């Protein structure tokens, strides 16, 4: 007999009362999705109870793909088609990632953002990230029981405009409405501040798999103000893995360039396990055999590991000092240091942070989950689900200065770094030559004084300027940064009123045509995706039915005679035989047959339970 499922009190979704929004931490190593349920933020698990989704996508022939745990397990056997740490490639050109340490991929020199050749064709980091985001979206909708109105997606505070736009493009491709791009340290501060009613100056030290951020925040009642942000968008836990990887190969006298891609991925996976073991043990051993037959079995002490990664630890302290200077505070002024990111579990990191700030860091929230929890709180608020105690204000900052190119290839900064967003700033410029009727506006981002040393974001032209002598025209250039940290630029000639503008789509972002093509491709594979999803759902229901039947037989098998028991066993065996296959209809039919075949058994069990409950009781007691 099929039993209806009833949720716990207060846990049933009520879409007419609340608009469902989630917070997503799109991480280098792992990604998470969280939501506010019953006024409490919580991470949402998959059907196996796992909250972390490995940020790994494996591409197969004919449009097939594996995402998350299954892809991660196969990374060593198919490294060229299994994309890991894709966040490191977001918004980056080929020249910037070609030297990515030990990457086994074939990078494609396409216009704009770097792309990777796989067995299923060329993929951009945006497409790969969209697969991860879509998986989290499906998980959230399954768990919450309705479609999402939007999501807050976190990004490293030190992500530039190109990387932010790439993240937003990936969300759009995954069918997500982005309510806000939120800086990861700020999200962590929201979770920590609201959880602990904290006030004062706090540092958020965020070391993830591929990025590092350090933010200084001032928390007062109801206000989260970012005073300064610094970081390195190419430094993370992966680099600690590579340091150990290089050491192991050097000790064995093996040149990394001679390794097969499968060996590179296998060894990287094993040294990551070794690194994690050294977080709780004074030494750990490696045991791996390469395809060449070489056997590597060194024992690494924690002291050796600490000396290997000391330069990386110091690299995190350089932007830390810079952020403190920008905020005009000292380590002694900091009330607490919040650790974010799985890499902060390493004792070498915690010791360095404690030594620099003169106090042990705060570790009462899970560093893997705190960013997603903070994003969920912000998403719930932006979706309009304002409740008691939700009167708080978030003041974030832009991490890198925005400027314009002037004559001689110089940069004139319009919006300096650490300016609170959203923001608009304007500055007047003039013409260089007599009779000049047009002006080229080149938008750049960075802290250097020369355009060649900064990142080019966009170019556009202002035409129709009245001919005048050089220096007579007045062109007002306005930079406007929205709450996501994304930029729009406007130029207006004051006398004639002629205008031009650009919503900055960086040279490493995606053109609308590219997005449209990817969406079209995703529609083409939607049927494949839905079939795979239906198969997985049927397999899960079949397993649930088999386990429930087995438990019922173990408890009350005596209620069936031999023939009835044989019939139930036969139905269960039939379901078990097809449950791991790929015929959805066969699985559903076998599941229904077992459910129908146990209806009478379920009724007898119910009668038995009622008789047991009423046994020895008088009628007037009932």
Curated annotation (Swiss-Prot):
It holds the Pfam family HSP70. SUPFAM superfamilies: Actin-like ATPase domain (SSF53067), Heat shock protein 70kD (HSP70), C-terminal subdomain (SSF100934), Heat shock protein 70kD (HSP70), peptide-binding domain (SSF100920). GO terms for biological process: iron-sulfur cluster assembly. It comes from the Bacteria. Keywords: ATP-binding, Chaperone, Nucleotide-binding. Coiled coil: none annotated. Belongs to the heat shock protein 70 family. Chaperone involved in the maturation of iron-sulfur cluster-containing proteins. Has a low intrinsic ATPase activity which is markedly stimulated by HscB. This is Chaperone protein HscA homolog. It comes from Burkholderia cenocepacia (strain ATCC BAA-245 / DSM 16553 / LMG 16656 / NCTC 13227 / J2315 / CF5610) (Burkholderia cepacia (strain J2315)).
